Amino acid sequence: MPTDSPDARRTLGLAATTGVGVGAIVGGGILALAGVSFVTTGPSTILAFALNGIIALMTVASFAELGSRFPESGGTYTFARKALTVEAAFAVGWVVWFASVVAAVLYALGFAVFLVPVLQQAFALLGGEAPTWIGGRFALLVYALAAVMFYAWSLMRSPTGGGQWTTIGKLVVFGLLLLGGFLVLVSDLPSLPELVGRFSPFFEDGASGLAQAMGYTFIALQGFGLIVAVGGNVKDPGRNIPRAMALSVGTALAIYIPLLFLIVAVGTGGQSVVALAEENPEILVANAARNFLGAPGYWLVVLAGLLSMLSALQANVLAASSFAATMAADRTLPLRIEGLSPDGRTPAVAIKLTAGMIAFVLVAVPDVAAAGAVSSLIFLGVFALVHGIAYLVRKRAFQPSPYQSPFFPMVPWVGGGLCLALALYQAAAVPSAGVLAALWLAAGAVLFVTHLAPRARVVDARSEGFDPQLIRLRGRSPLILVPVANPENAGVLVKMAEAIAPKGVSRTQLLSVVRPPAKWEDGKLPTELVDAQGILGGALSAAIAVDLRPEALITLSDDPWAEITRIAQRSRPDAILLGIGELHQSIAAGPLERLIDRVSTDIVILRAPTDWDPDQAARILVPSRGGRAQSPIRARVLGSLTREARREVTFLGVLRESMDSSAVRASERELKALARDEARGSGTAVVLQRDDLVAEVVQRSRECDLMILGLRRSGRGRSVFGGPMLDIAMATSCPLLMISQRG
């Protein structure tokens, strides 16, 4: 949930953070799935939950390591964005957002189902008979929608939505249920053989039945992932996120295992637990509680169900809203979804959108069970991915995480493999779940490619420039080629290279091209090579001064520009940084034009005094004719420049005086969007109406420390050097960066 003051958002302590996980995990899963599991595998359901608990704790270890390293909202989406590509991050965020929405739908309907017997009992206490419609589909939808709207409203007022009281209430109810059950067991303690007999046969269908039960019931423990979804709200996240996740799963297991034991030991009413479960698996827990505590036991389960469904609903609405708001901040969802409440504490627009999606699925999707299977499948697949990301990040990261999972790399390998196996089982058991997940992902791919990709890639490029560790975490080591011809320019070029290719992440290759001497003398270096060594020696000295460790290369060629092209085509650098003294038409339309035409890489051209330093660029001017052809490289450069110091970045649009007001407003909106995407927090947009574009930009350039001009490429690798941009470059004297996005 992005805000302008991230520290102010960290309002959740250990107890509140644990409450998010406990609220999402405890109650709903066991009440809905215990009966199905007992039918499938008998008393070994206890073992199935215990084994799932081990898998969950291994997954918690990977989640906790990533959550403490990246204490931001967004959870699994954020992890994918840090370690993979923006496209992969969108895919993860898109499906997990949907999975959380569907989970919220299931819990809203679960609340409605548990509310019906309460209403029926209320009518009975009032001396009347409950009408049949109170349990009909329309009434269930009304109850469910009311719960969704209530939590959406409460979350817009408070980051936690007041759900902690519901969580505390259900823990108290489950505690009373367990206490009552064990008192009954102790008061009428059977002999050991009799007690053991109630658990026989332990396996109803052998190992296959146990595996099936594990596949069915793992979702009863998966809510711990919602903790990292709100990681940006957690105080002292390096300490509290790992503890809260472990406490959440531990609390769930401390309730589930004893409750399952009591169901078999004292809750079957004299028949086998499998027979009792087969009668009505959905309400097995309630029937078992009635058997060992009478009517109070039944109503305790109903109350536990109501509170469990409400707390899980609240946790999923909170997490889904957090996913949506974080994705909007990265432009992997439309920017307007990032909108905050008036006090800046909650993502109001994302909450409204999420509530609307939940309501739509409630009303429009008749087969909610299939949708629930999709949710389970997505979570399992994403959990397997998180294990893989945890492994990659541990291997690639420069600094250790505040929390590191034990037994590395066994935990991510084994945990990821088990989660993947459960996901494949789920896909095979419910084929429609895989189909629905694929359809949702395909719809997202169309949305991303047609609408979201340009802005998302720009923001991602800016993020890589601002935080170079992203490049390292993604397993890349970009190469920057820096041809050096003039020893006086070597220092400023190295400083610029260090700004856009920081040490420890990128590689820099210094290149000096020497014309072959007319005559070689044995035992003596030609003057040309001696001069080249001096040039590279000066560049290397400047590089060492800024702790950069570049490669150095000297080549021989009669045509330096053609040689630069050849080296670029061979080494395939991510960018070429060129330094020029004076820019004139013969260079721009000649060798420079041919170089840009023949290489498929980003081009950065620097014109600056020899004593200039990028740190001096406090005020940056970006003339723009609109469009996003140069946005990714410009965003990356601006991100690099704003990494160490805050800059004032002005995007300048100059329109003809004859342009009508509606076109001016449209241009202003577009330029403001560019400024937000490329220089968030430091960019402003200025739109003027002047007939002399060049004169206006030249006048403004006198007040800036650096100007950035984009050189458009049209067609395959072609640059357009003519027109106003070249005129501006030739008419100004301020430090200048000209950039050209790869073709």
Predicted regions and their residues:
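Helix-loop-helix junctions that connect adjacent transmembrane segments
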Residues: 2-8, 45-46, 50, 125-139, ...
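Hydrophobic transmembrane alpha-helices that form the core helical bundles
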Residues: 40, 48, 57-148, 305-326, ...
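TM-loop-TM module centered on a large, flexible mid-protein loop between adjacent transmembrane helices
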Residues: 78-79, 85, 117-122, 200, ...
